[in-house]
Amino acid sequence: MKRFIYILGLLILSLTSFSDALVQKNISLDIAQNLASEVLKEAKKEKVNISLVILDKGGNVVLSMKEDNAAVHTMKTAQKKAFTALSFGITTTEFASRVERVPNLTQIENTTTLGGGIPIKAGNETIGSIGIGGAPSGAIDEKIGNAALSRISNLLK
């Protein structure tokens, strides 16, 4: 009987540890919608038509949208920006600096050095990313994304 209780205790402890390991922060559709709304407000202030892609921690598209007058290439560009930011956990602007030191990084499929890709973080943990394309420069795309992220920062805790 003691052996049974001992084994049962170990089983319960291991299940508790296992369930804790499965709990991960991730970007939800609700957060993605709030972020997209803020991005569109910022894009309107900048008088640019953009496309945006928001990825979750696993690289799945949570939300993508293209404004009516955004150029045709902006959706694919936004996707690459989001993928790059998620893959490396840094902005695409920072990735461009890294590529200067390690040019072979450009061989990684679906990455880009164009500004406008930003990791979405909860504390120090990357829980997703956003890619924005359509402004005359990647710096403006990134400015739009950072402003929007700062306005929803309370949702990322």
Language-model-derived ranges and their functions:
Residues 5-16:
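Bacterial N-terminal signal peptides
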Residues 19-157:
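Flexible, solvent-exposed loop/hinge segments and secondary-structure transition points
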